[in-house]
Amino acid sequence: MAGGREIKTKIKSVQNTRKVTRALEMVSASKIRKAQERMKTSRPYAQAMKQVIGHLAQASTDFQHPFLIEREQVKRVGYIVISSDRGLAGGLNNNLFRKMLGEVRPWQGTGAEIDVVTIGQKASAFFRRIKVNMVGSVTHLGDSPQVEQLIGVIKVMIDAFIEGKVDRVYLVYNRFVNTMTQKASFDQLLPLPAAEHKVAHHDWDYLYEPDAASVLEHVMTRYIESLVYQAVLENVASEHAARMVAMKAASDNANKMIGTLQLVYNKARQAAITQEISEIVSGAAAV
C-alpha cells in the first residue's frame, strides 16, 4: 500500500485536474447558448433560400443548372468534412470520422476516387494522417465563424464539380439535436437532391429580372454556401455540447477517484496509528 504522503499528493493532483474540468464545463455551458442562438438565427435564411431555389428551378424550363443534373457515372466523390479545432469533446470527431470511412468504402469498391475538403483542425490532421487526397482546408474559425471564412474551400469543391472533376459532393458534419445528442450527418450537397429543388405546386407570384435562369445562376452558389455555413454552426454547437458533457463526466470521475483515494489514505493512516500503538504497548510490556 502506498504511503500517506504519496496518497495525499495524488489526491491533490486529482483535485487540480477537477478544477480544470469544471472550468471547461462552465465555459462550454456558456458558449453553447450563444452557439444555439447563432444556429437558430441562420436557419430561416437557409430555409428561405431552399424555397427560392425550388421556385427558380421550376420556373426556368429552358435552362437547367449544372447543380441540378444527376450524372450517370460517378468516378470521383468529394466530401466537405467539418470538425472542431480543439479536442476534449469526447468521441465527437472520432465518431464522425469513423462513420465517414464507412460511407466512403462502398464508393471505393466501385473504383471511385475520393477528394476531401476539411473545415477544422481535427479533420485536417486526421485525413493527412491516413493519406486521403485533401484538396482544401481551413482551420481556426473560432466560436463565431463567418461565411467569408468558408468561401475559399467551398469554391474549390464547386469548381471541381462544374468542371467535371468531381461527380458528387457530400457534406459531413455533426448535427446538433440537443445538449446530450449530436448526430453524424451525411448530406448530399451536389447535385442537389430532387427534393431540394422541387415543390408540389406553382402558386407563387415572384417576378424575376432579367429572367429566372440568370437569377438561378447567381443564387445557386449562395445557396450552397448557406448550407455549408449552417452545417458549421451546427457543428460548433455540437462541439460545445459534447465538451460540456465530457468535462462533466471527467469531473464526476475525479470526485469518485478522490473519494476512493481518501478512503485508502484513511485506511493507511489508521494502519500506521494501530502499528504505533502496538509498538508502544509491546515496548511497555517488555519493560
Swiss-Prot record:
InterPro entries assigned to the protein according to its UniProt record, in alphabetical order: ATP_synth_F1_ATPase_gsu, ATP_synth_F1_gsu, ATP_synth_F1_gsu_CS
The keyword Membrane is assigned to this record: yes
Keyword Ribonucleoprotein: no
Segments forming a coiled coil: none
An annotated Gene Ontology molecular function: proton-transporting ATP synthase activity, rotational mechanism
Biological process according to GO: proton motive force-driven plasma membrane ATP synthesis
Localization annotation: Cell inner membrane
Keyword terms: ATP synthesis, Cell inner membrane, Cell membrane, CF(1), Hydrogen ion transport, Ion transport, Membrane, Transport
Main location: membrane
Topological type in the membrane: Peripheral membrane protein
A family per Pfam: ATP-synt
GO cellular component: plasma membrane; proton-transporting ATP synthase complex
Gene3D superfamilies noted in UniProt: 3.40.1380.10, ATP synthase, gamma subunit, helix hairpin domain
Alphabetical list of PROSITE patterns matching this protein: ATPASE_GAMMA
HAMAP family xrefs: ATP_synth_gamma_bact
Subunit field text: F-type ATPases have 2 components, CF(1) - the catalytic core - and CF(0) - the membrane proton channel. CF(1) has five subunits: alpha(3), beta(3), gamma(1), delta(1), epsilon(1). CF(0) has three main subunits: a, b and c.
Protein function: Produces ATP from ADP in the presence of a proton gradient across the membrane. The gamma chain is believed to be important in regulating ATPase activity and the flow of protons through the CF(0) complex.
NCBIfam families (UniProt xref): ATPsyn_F1gamma (TIGR01146), PRK05621.1-1 (NF004144)
Recorded family membership: Belongs to the ATPase gamma chain family.
Descriptive protein name: ATP synthase gamma chain
